[in-house]
């Protein structure tokens, strides 16, 4: 007999983990909706060229991590490795920037796939929540997105994080910086790994982005992008920093921060968890501005800015707060009966509370003893227990037990039906 198991780098969600996952999804969608974002859904796979062009063929995402396959028409497709490129493709294809007031503000919550070595906070199938503001150069939105990300973490009572920011220049000034990096790293190539030596020619920014290489002194002393910014770009970066200062959002300028995707040009930022549970995979929110991506995808010459949140990492960071922040669901009720002849009455009451009162109600469809009912209620994380017992029912009474506060009341049927 074959024993099937899930593929490496994937997880099964159920019980509390599934509940927390859905609550976090609902929290993120409802929070960003108040900022004027509307949800978009895109296919789980796209033509591979979309990601190759947007992320850059020399990026780890494209060269090592994408799940590629050919369809029956011999076309290369890829499972979605990140959310932004697919959203931009959908916006361009459906002409949303031409038929919608600008800026266009979109959010998404989607599964993504990357072939990486699994560890805490890094799976081969993971979930990404993201927002994109499209069709505006106004740097207020750079500030707004950082403020939104900061608000999300604060509302979740996550405090063990730092915010790092940097400014990646325009394509022209960036090319001058890249040339300077290539000259510098050629002089120090023996201090780099073989992979980084290859990247000197293909894309030296990936050396700065490499978690191990970035810790080396030779990489830390590499030419900085700030030396290649125009006066206008410096002024723009200073204005963003001033807005963050004015609203008491603490940040650190990290000139080695370039993000792992080639489409960024302008502000880039990362919210980095200091949780020991996420060592090595500590970025929980990352994003930035992209000036060329929409045009590269066949759309108008508009800019955009966005960020993505790794849901699995955020849940790990959230678990350290020791507070049940997400548990905002309505009370869960469990209906039980001690005597078989009360089964139909219990079923009727279950349906009334579900349909008329819109309560979260489950039922035990067998008469059983009290201790078994209480054990089951505990396993199901039930807060309120409604019990139909023969003696109390003869007096038109029903037992309501508050398992959270260890209280018990005898209520009439009308009082039970009045629960909201």
Curated annotation (Swiss-Prot):
Annotated catalysed reactions: tRNA(His) + L-histidine + ATP = L-histidyl-tRNA(His) + AMP + diphosphate + H(+)
Keyword terms: Aminoacyl-tRNA synthetase, ATP-binding, Cytoplasm, Ligase, Nucleotide-binding, Protein biosynthesis
Entry-linked SUPFAM superfamilies: Class II aaRS ABD-related (SSF52954), Class II aaRS and biotin synthetases (SSF55681)
GO cellular component, one term: cytoplasm
UniProt keyword Cytoplasm present: yes
EC class name: ligase
Compartment(s): Cytoplasm
A Pfam family: tRNA-synt_His
GO biological process, one term: histidyl-tRNA aminoacylation
GO molecular function terms listed in the Swiss-Prot or TrEMBL record: ATP binding; histidine-tRNA ligase activity
EC number(s) stated in the UniProt entry for this protein: 6.1.1.21
Family named by the database record: Belongs to the class-II aminoacyl-tRNA synthetase family.
PANTHER family with a match to the protein in the record: HISTIDINE--TRNA LIGASE, MITOCHONDRIAL-RELATED, HISTIDYL-TRNA SYNTHETASE
Quaternary state and interactors: Homodimer.
NCBIfam families linked: hisS
This protein's name: Histidine--tRNA ligase
Organism: Ureaplasma parvum serovar 3 (strain ATCC 700970)
